[in-house]
Every structure is written in structure tokens, then in C-alpha cells.
Amino acid sequence: MSEKKINLLDLDRKALRVLFTEMGEKPFRADQLMKWIYHFGVSDFEEMTNINKVLRAKLAAKCEIVAPEISSYQKSVDGTIKFAINVGDGQEVETVYIPEDDRATLCVSSQVGCALECTFCSTAQQGFNRNLTVAEIVGQIWRVADFIGFVKDTGERPITNVVMMGMGEPLLNLKNVIPAMDIMLDDFGFSLSKRRVTLSTSGVVPALDKLGDALDVALAVSIHAPNDELRDVLVPVNKKYPLEEFLGGIRRYIAKSNANRGRVTVEYVMLDHINDSTDQAHELAKLMKDTPCKVNLIPFNPYPGSPYGRSSNSRIDRFSKVLMEYGLTVIVRKTRGDDIDAACGQLAGDIRDRTKRLAKKQMQESQISVTMN
């Protein structure tokens, strides 16, 4: 049996330099290779003309550049495109491209399914299957960039922002998320500004501390409730890491990071008559008083079988005004791609039926406890 080839999309620049050194080559070859892959979308070693033929042959014998394939896509009336990405074994994840006048954002998945069981999220209903590899994470960007169109010979890319807000909890896959985000930030990788790469988390506090030691990227935090009693229901990981512990981790991250410009984004999904009263707005404002933040109010995006409804515009408006009375910056998120189930909280769709659900004990122990070791 032939030796399995190394997928170069799994390696950040540090790991690539080690690989080239082990091959008896100069480490700077890693920089050249990354530029071909991430700036120009090249996967054929023969097209890498500033790398000599002997080395190209060595690379072809030992390595490969393989990104997961796009299985299908849907385009919204607002220009949003939802991609189903085949990650093997009959499993898919979803990736969403959101074009705007001055930027283009890609919402990237970090896991097949999710272990956290947030009750308002479609992805959570399919359960957790496995973590994505580095290649499967950066491969989402690589495939969509190729689909939209690399501008050959210039290195210009059609994606300006990446948000780790797709399927899965990124902090439960730190082993692969950190090198993947390194590639996003690397000048020889996707060359994105640290303020244009955002990780969203529901609050796995020990992993948040590890992230702060490893990377400086923008942080969005899924709060969704102004107290532990309600958050225990909406975001069950709160039972393990309650709000005060989560807020402590957020403040520690802010102290280490400058990508956030001194504050984080608080995500708060608006659920009709569940978490959207004016009393709850006052409670949320008081909760966040010692945590520098802006608040992103997200109108709930219903999905089949959802137990919740979307807050009315009037309730969202009243909630927003209360927060602003406390001096908080408040943004009401514009829903994008909801006609193709690509909006916040809707990712999973038809994939749910093709992804097996693991037992609750395995989800909790292997994902929340073991991953932190």
C-alpha cells in the first residue's frame, strides 16, 4: 500500500517550513508554495513556475493539495449563496457567502453538527458528528474563492471577511481552528486583517483562554439571555460555564487582544416573548456594564420544527432603545439568505438527515472535557 500523501492545506506556514526542512529544502519554499495556493488558487505543482522541477516532482510524490468539494449551492434573491461542502463519508457542512457593496463575508463551519444543543439553532438539532480538519476549514474558503473567481496573476481574492459562525462550536475544535485561522491571517495565506476574521463562541471558557494565548482575532460571544436561569435553557453549555465565568473569560480575552479594539460583539437572538421584554433589556444592560461591547440583536430565523418565533419589529425596537439608554452601541442585524435557510441559526437544512447523531454522553465527554486536555 502506498504511503498516504500529506495534504498541504492541513499545514500552516510554520508546519510547512518544518516539512521543507525535513525534505532537505530551504524553509522559504513554504512562503512560495503558500502564495501559489492561497493567492492564486493553484493546486497543480506543475503550475508553480518559481519552484524548480526537481522540487515540484518531490512535492507531487509526497504531497497533495485537496480541498473538500462543493456538492451544491443555492443563491438567495439578496445575492447570498449557501454552499453544501462534501467533507467525505456522506457528510456535508454548509458555508455561506454574503456579498455587500464594500466587502464580501464568508461564514465558515468548524464541525459537522454541534455538541452544544442550543435550543434555537437548527444545527444543534442534528447533533454532533466530528471536528473538521484544517484542510476542511480553509478548504471552504479556497473552494468558494475559486467558485466566485480568483483574479489570476494579481492575487486578488473575492473574500474580504471570514466569520467562524457556521456549523459547530469553534472552541471545541481548537486543535484545527487555530492553524486554520493562522492561514487566514498569514500574509502568504489568505492575508486577511485580524479585524476581518471573527470567531463566535457560546462560551467554552477554558478554550477561550487558550485562544487568547494563541491568536488575536475579533471575538463575538453568543449571550442570548440576560440571566443564568434562561440561558441554561437556551444555551445549555451555560450549566458548565455560567454567565459570570463566561464574562470573566471575555474580559481576559479583551485584555490580550487588539483585534477587537477594546470590545467584543455580543450576539443576542430575539425570541418572541422569551428573551425580548424591556425588563430583560434592562437586565442585559446591567449584566454587560463591566464588559466593553457592542450588542448585535439578531431577529430569530425560524426553521421547521422550531419551538420559537421571531420577535416583532416593535419588540426589537423597544429592546434596542433600552440598551442604548445605558450607552450601549446596538445593531439590529439585517437578515440575509433566509429564503434559502442560510441565515443565522438556520444552517443544517437537508444535511441533518444525512448526519448521524451521537449519544449525549459522548458529546459532552469527548467534546467538552477531552478536547480541553
Swiss-Prot record:
Question: Which purpose does this protein serve, as stated in its record?
Answer: Specifically methylates position 2 of adenine 2503 in 23S rRNA and position 2 of adenine 37 in tRNAs. m2A2503 modification seems to play a crucial role in the proofreading step occurring at the peptidyl transferase center and thus would serve to optimize ribosomal fidelity.
Q: What else is known?
A: Reaction proceeds by a ping-pong mechanism involving intermediate methylation of a conserved cysteine residue.
Q: Which residues are catalytic?
A: E94 (proton acceptor), C344 (s-methylcysteine intermediate)
Binding residues annotated for [4Fe-4S] cluster, in chain numbering:
C114, C118, C121
What is the protein named? Dual-specificity RNA methyltransferase RlmN
Per its record, the protein catalyses:
adenosine(2503) in 23S rRNA + 2 reduced [2Fe-2S]-[ferredoxin] + 2 S-adenosyl-L-methionine = 2-methyladenosine(2503) in 23S rRNA + 5'-deoxyadenosine + L-methionine + 2 oxidized [2Fe-2S]-[ferredoxin] + S-adenosyl-L-homocysteine; adenosine(37) in tRNA + 2 reduced [2Fe-2S]-[ferredoxin] + 2 S-adenosyl-L-methionine = 2-methyladenosine(37) in tRNA + 5'-deoxyadenosine + L-methionine + 2 oxidized [2Fe-2S]-[ferredoxin] + S-adenosyl-L-homocysteine
What EC number(s) does this enzyme carry?
A: 2.1.1.192
Q: Which PROSITE patterns match?
A: RADICAL_SAM (PS51918)
Q: How is the cofactor bound?
A: Binds 1 [4Fe-4S] cluster. The cluster is coordinated with 3 cysteines and an exchangeable S-adenosyl-L-methionine.
Q: Which family does it belong to?
A: Belongs to the radical SAM superfamily. RlmN family.
Residues annotated as binding S-adenosyl-L-methionine = G168, E169, S200, S222, I223, H224, N301
The gene from which this protein is expressed is: rlmN
HAMAP family in the cross-refs? RNA_methyltr_RlmN
